Amino acid sequence: MKTLLAVLLAACVLTQVLSAPSNEQRVRRNMIRGRPRGGMKKTPPMSSVSHMINFDNVVSSTFTQTLDHFDSSVGKTFQQRYYHNNQWYKAGGPAFLMLGGEGPESSYWVSYPGLEITNLAAKQGAWVFDIEHRFYGETHPTSDMSVPNLKYLSSAQAIEDAAAFIKAMTAKFPQLANAKWVTFGGSYSGALAAWTRAKHPELVYAAVGSSGPVQAEVDFKEYLEVVQNSITRNSTECAASVTQGFNLVASLLQTSDGRKQLKTAFHLCQDIQMDDKSLKYFWETVYSPYMEVVQYSGDAAGSFATQLTISHAICRYHINTKSTPLQKLKQVNDYFNQVSGYFGCNDIDYNGFISFMKDETFGEAQSDRAWVWQTCTEFGYYQSTSSATAGPWFGGVSNLPAQYYIDECTAIYGAAYNSQEVQTSVDYTNQYYGGRDNLNTDRILLPNGDIDPWHALGKLTSSNSNIVPVVINGTAHCADMYGASSLDSMYLTNARQRISDVLDGWLHAN
């Protein structure tokens, strides 16, 4: 962007691990363009929750999908993975479709009891479906992920996939001939849920798009502004300590002895290189735990519910006056890695990362290569330090400019993917979907947590009574999608009720 067992997190944010010459594992940083490994919509391994699920009605299958919905001359198809469950279906009930996003899907979202979508399905008597996004998980539309093939990867194609799927399922299951279809999603797929309703109102009756960044933006400087503000909101003392630490890192980078201290503190696999790209890649590694903790703080998703929260994973260390500023950063990094199950040295090899991302097979780099492609060709979403407020707080406005990420587009996919192309693509995305201010649709619910950095690109207000933003005080990314917990705030509880009430009103209006 979806209380779960404590083992959930390790599989949700699986880290890319390589063998190091010293026999110590190399841990590649977890956050890539705001996306943790496994995707932004947290999902546990089914083995950890299967004992809580009734699988009698859960079906996993594939659907013959069109490769190019906009050029019939291509004439190719592929097998798209999907899941469905009619456990809660009642005659005349609606169909709920969870849209896959930038990671693999599983039967979790159609079967796990107590989730927002399954609770709503039980209330409305809905048949629940989940379709995996092309080029993610086991859905491989082409033989590899070369640039010519990646041109079939876009949100527009994914929306047409959903439309074709709805038509096919309506034909396959006569019970659904007159069903009202509701699309659901979280994070990128939350935006997809809203856009699918907008592009296909004849097929999609309503949408619930949780934490959907419906505004594309090249220089997403607001992301780190929200990280700063969310930590400050938790504790001004903590925030002062965090920025003190980041600015100390900037100072230590200037000397050989300082860089040695940083290598030891952050347990780096390599010496810090002073070329521009390597330094920026190092900064991404430093920021990554803070970004991920804030993005999911308090979500009822494994360790983020209690351990990886702003209070426990960040401020608990930064208000410890017995530690030095550098020790505090180290303690946050060590604790994050320990809880997440990441053991080994932190890999800061920029060139190695680019080589990893250039892998064209459906292998270890699959989801990262696909998601970065979409940022380069549609969305931007580049979490920069260019903000006049957040930049200095994070140790320097030039530490991570948007251009750094654009240069990665060029390095990974080729010279055609340059600044002009990225900006043109982002402008087109906003024109095609309407951006935040011109969503041309109705009957969409748009929940957002106000400590989530992604809410800055969401739709938070609306003059249209049938476009319903639900801003949830003190919650993070996709918080509404998970199961209710005793730790939930009244704001989150009330938001889930609001979503349920609005959707109920729409479904029974006619």
Curated annotation (Swiss-Prot):
| Claim: Membrane is one of the keywords in the record | no
Question: Under what name is this protein listed?
Answer: Putative serine protease K12H4.7
EC class of the enzyme, as a word: hydrolase
- Listed GO MF terms: dipeptidyl-peptidase activity; serine-type exopeptidase activity
- Signal peptide (residue range): 1-19
Glycosylation sites (chain numbering): N234, N473
Q: What is its EC number?
A: 3.4.-.-
Q: Which SUPFAM superfamilies has this protein been placed in?
A: alpha/beta-Hydrolases (SSF53474)
Keywords, sorted A to Z: Glycoprotein, Hydrolase, Protease, Serine protease, Signal
Family of the protein in this entry: Belongs to the peptidase S28 family.
- Which Pfam family, any one, appears in the UniProt record? Peptidase_S28
